[in-house]
Amino acid sequence: MTAIRNVKGILGTKLGMTQVWDENNKLVPVTVVQADSNVVTQLRDAAKDGYTAVQIGYGQIDPRKVTKPLAGHFEKAGVTPRRHVVELRTNDSDAYSLGQELSVEIFEAGQKVDVVGTSKGKGFAGVMKRHGFHGVGASHGAHKNHRKPGSIGGASTPSRVFKGLKMAGRMGGERHTTLNLTVHAIDAEKSLLLIKGAIPGARGRVVLVRTAVKTTVKGA
């Protein structure tokens, strides 16, 4: 299926959060993303692949650590091997060329973007931390079960526990997308994106910044 909209995107590294002043002398919390060394490694077209897309590579890697098929893939694009690769479906893939370098200037201040990343891993967590359960009462007969989930519903009917029931387990470390964030500022010289608010992931993790899928219209 061919994309019906133009999507711009770039891979970067989350450096952390800070505060900056806006034009109204108000402090704005922003996340700093460094997005350098992005190159186009492959182009998809509807005639050959059935859809249009652009593949982007990011991050340097020792060529000795790259498999032979991937090494040939990067060599065909005329670029050095990259550690991370992502594909974006877009209707304007013909506007790109193999080996083209992408910078943070593909975005502009005030633009709405979505940020995709891997959330922080929390390890094995109980239902109160993982799902926000209230727990059992502090008294009135409660005995060593204050943080337990309670009944999981497996009585003689239906004689089983339903799939997807909220229970204790590993928390975090999952792919997460934060929608409709605003690009506060761009530093092209240092390849930095300043994005209002928080984005998923820990410092040093790779994130994808792309054109917003949905845009919120005030008063609509």
UniProtKB/Swiss-Prot annotation:
Key word tRNA-binding present: no
Source organism per UniProt: Renibacterium salmoninarum (strain ATCC 33209 / DSM 20767 / JCM 11484 / NBRC 15589 / NCIMB 2235)
InterPro entries from the UniProt entry: Ribosomal_uL3 (IPR000597), Ribosomal_uL3_bac/org-type (IPR019927), Ribosomal_uL3_CS (IPR019926), Transl_B-barrel_sf (IPR009000)
Subunit-level organization: Part of the 50S ribosomal subunit. Forms a cluster with proteins L14 and L19.
A Pfam short name: Ribosomal_L3
CC terms in the record's Gene Ontology section: cytosolic large ribosomal subunit
Stretch list, region Disordered: 137-159
Name of the protein: Large ribosomal subunit protein uL3
